[in-house]
């Protein structure tokens, strides 16, 4: 016997969270809980403002329609990426496809303070990997901060994310301030320039490896082994169903590229599922999931070790 519940939620964010030039005051989303007999599965649907094609309201309409279809015995998935991902996660839990084992390590997001980063990395087992957002300030400043971190911590590898912020000139200004001897310890720089061709040229000219992120969601993108391209960053909430995520990971691995499962600022429930997906599909690769500290609360399932309060399902608004 099938049954389902849908919950709507809103989590206050820390004051300093800015996405694409807009401040994110709250993180809004939905949960779906599917039941079939004794089995249960949860999924999170939380379109990311400025990045997702669909709004929260559109996702809610699509989710409620899909849930009603599922209750009638239909097995298809919605088209909207965030809804397809959340629904497929709930189904994967329900059927036991999604393993319980999780990779709760996360590459810490660094603000540029090497002392703070040394402390955060001290307890990290294995490789010392951190992530730095670049492109928010002057390119020269970014280059100096990255150089300082790599100089201060000799076994550090950095993942950098520019979100296509730079012109070719700005990208070169950044590289100029990173010691060529340290550049090999930049694991990758996500989408440095506004166009893929400019990003490819940057990688060739500087020896700094790049990764594709936004490109994966463009219609003309194809997976290829290219000089200077080392990784792809996969954000499941923006990608679509779990099957589509698996296909992208497999395509990357077949070409020798690193595939990194990355957060779209999901709630703790969604993040714990991403940690399980990372352990399952990209074992041995540190996922990019260090976003919970941007929020003021957890929900339903807590992240191990987090001191944030965790709301129970009874405290959420139920729609179905």
Swiss-Prot record:
Pfam families: MenC_N, MR_MLE_C
GO BP: menaquinone biosynthetic process
Cysteine disulfide links: none
Positions that bind Mg(2+): 161, 190, 213
Catalyses which reaction(s): (1R,6R)-6-hydroxy-2-succinyl-cyclohexa-2,4-diene-1-carboxylate = 2-succinylbenzoate + H2O
Entry annotation: catalytic residues: 133 (proton donor), 235 (proton acceptor)
UniProt EC number: 4.2.1.113
UniProt keyword list: Lyase, Magnesium, Menaquinone biosynthesis, Metal-binding
Source organism, top-level taxon: Bacteria
Listed pathway(s): Quinol/quinone metabolism; 1,4-dihydroxy-2-naphthoate biosynthesis; 1,4-dihydroxy-2-naphthoate from chorismate: step 4/7; Quinol/quinone metabolism; menaquinone biosynthesis
Cofactor: a divalent metal cation
MF-aspect GO terms: magnesium ion binding; O-succinylbenzoate synthase activity
Gene3D superfamilies (UniProt xref): Enolase-like C-terminal domain (3.20.20.120), Enolase-like, N-terminal domain (3.30.390.10)
Similarity section: Belongs to the mandelate racemase/muconate lactonizing enzyme family. MenC type 1 subfamily.
Record's function text: Converts 2-succinyl-6-hydroxy-2,4-cyclohexadiene-1-carboxylate (SHCHC) to 2-succinylbenzoate (OSB).
Protein name: o-succinylbenzoate synthase
